[in-house]
Amino acid sequence: MSNSTFPYDAKSEQAYKSNPAIRLFGNRFSNDQTSMELLCEFLLVITSKKRIDDAEYATAFPPITLLIDWNNVELEYAPKARLNLKLFAFLSASRLDSRHLTHREHYTQLIQELKKRIKVDSNDKTQVVKTLENLLLGFQGAGSGRTWCTQSFLPLSKSLLACEAIWKETSARRFNPNSWGNLFETRGKYFSTSQHAFYAGGGELLYLQICNAMKQNPEAIQAWNLDAKLEFSSEELEPGKLLNSLERGMAKFFSACPKFIDDLAEFIDDKLDPETAAKTDMHEQQPRFVEAGWCNSATWQEGYLLAVEMNRILSSGLDVMDSVYYLETLFMLHTLRNLIMQSSRCLSNGEAKWPGYYMAINRSDEENGTLKRISHQSLKNIEKTIYMAIRSHMQGTDIVQDEKILKEADTRSGHKFFLKMAKQAGLVIPKRGAWARFVLTPQILRVLVTTIVPQQGRITYETFKQLIRARWGMVFDEAGFGKCCEWLGVEKVYLSSDTDAWLLEMLAESGLLMHLSDSCALVLHPNQGNDGAGS
């Protein structure tokens, strides 16, 4: 299978040459990156100033003309570190042994400076500061238990998004800096913003998948939509219109957060101590740009689906907190889909048909041994597909098939990573123990309905199942389990016609089902929406 990369040819990169999972999927997914950090990193790219060659842009995505002309040039973006903001919000809740003397002293200085700016009775200033600190701590999104600078906020506003910053404790012990200012005399000596430990590159990868998808010929998109029976709307089939709708959706998402939060975060990070932000975010009086990674060019179809599904969530009328959690769930599901589909594509020499795999979904308390066995077998076959794809990707290359490299690839970005994220999403149970199998949670179901059912609309239950199968490879009923058995290469089993009755019950309990008769039901969109290219 052709293994070209986007947005530039990465074959000379050390990560590409040394890691088969990165060669297969892009740079990079990692089991160290939580689902919230995956979303935060993606939105950090969205909100940062970006440039392609000499062309800078501040929109969420490149203008369509720039996208079309984009050829063999890295994407660069200028993320902010927001160390003052993280220090103010997270230091008091961090481990005592992680609080270096310079951190504590600068925290005290920030508090003193903030008190000078507060216009209330002096006796109340300490309480006001504590209230503001607790308010920002309440937006903690990921990294609880880590050093304060490696933690992240919920991505509710642009001013709460920050790049990864790693405190280099070994360097601090060795050189013993005695002031906050000393920490920035040599870039990267005490704080690393380029280590990619927790912001491992997964968010960059998904952003690039969408950009790559928007570059595709509309005729190729339309042919794929028809062949795979995806049933996109006419607007969704035009990359330019879909891109414009995504821009509006992202703008609406960030405008939903109260302006007070943005203003408070900017004030604490930049106004109390402008020097720190200047040292971390600027280089020679210009924004400090960093290079994003790359994705596999063949994954444009997954990227296009992600763009459509994101757009439907952003234009569905959800409040900002629900939008964050829906997007987090979507990103987990998409990552799983990307791992399976790209692996299937690899093993079929690029000829895999959508969906390329099947997930046999059970009810969580399923007692039928046959249904549980098929679900378990579908999970094991998916794991095997990813396992084999990584190994086949090493064949015919100059990479030595080192067992250590393969084990790391399996754990960090391969089938073990797939299983870990699937369990984290609630798509696979039990979290521990044998006979793991696929199930649905109410949260996953609502995300599926939101991204499949037209806004302010409804579709038949049968159509709903067909579209889930087409877009996600998930099957629930006798016909779907039959297709799964065919994919598994095992004898088809005969099941009762009410195998999927539990799904109807789950939809009804969520208020998403309207019964027209005993044989016909409609699945309803859960929210009232406006704008967007949904259908």
Where are these regions (language model features)?
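Alpha-helical repeat scaffolds in large eukaryotic proteins
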Residues: L44-S48, D69, S92, Q112-K115, ...
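Generic recognition of cysteine residues
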Residues: C40, C149, C163, C211, ...
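Extended, Lys/Arg-rich, non-catalytic nucleic-acid recognition/anchoring regions
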Residues: L110, R117-Q216
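Charged, amphipathic alpha-helical stretches
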Residues: M1-D124
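C-terminal structured domains
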Residues: N362-S535
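Eukaryotic partner-binding/assembly regions in large regulatory complexes
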Residues: E169-T170, R174-P177, N182-I429
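Generic structural signal of hydrophobic/aromatic residues within well-ordered alpha-helices
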Residues: F25, L39-L43, I64, L87, ...
